[in-house]
Amino acid sequence: IRAVSPMTAEDYCAGGCTALLDAIGRTVSKLAGVQRNTAEEYRAEKVMFVIITDGEENASREYSSQKVKSMIRREQEQYGWEFIFLGANIDAGETAAQFGISADRAVDYVPDGAGTALNFQAISETAALFRSAAPMPQAPLAAIRRDMKRRGRRR
């Protein structure tokens, strides 16, 4: 965590475009490199990779869907990485499937303050359980699913 730099305006620019494939591809590549180049005793034993988006892919230039899917599959199969996909204003299950992320790890969420806060609460609980348990916990993600079912899509 100490190695993570604060986000700046240059790092994050909201402009109506979603370069989702590039964001996922770059981040998987960087994190995989860090894992492989870190001494084994300091390397993360488990990796939980969370993707949160409120829009469809419409602006990537570096990575294709197939390339990202291949990268994700490699990390899942060779290193046991777990991927979670949270999406608003899209079909999260369908989008996640394009990247090789299973339906039980893909959740639609309500894109408002309460829905976003619930995302972070659920991911915090998932991470805590993930660190202490062998299988990936499903209960925290179920809260997001219930919220979506109860309150529906909001813009």
Model-predicted regions and their roles:
Residues 1-155:
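Acidic, low-complexity intrinsically disordered regions
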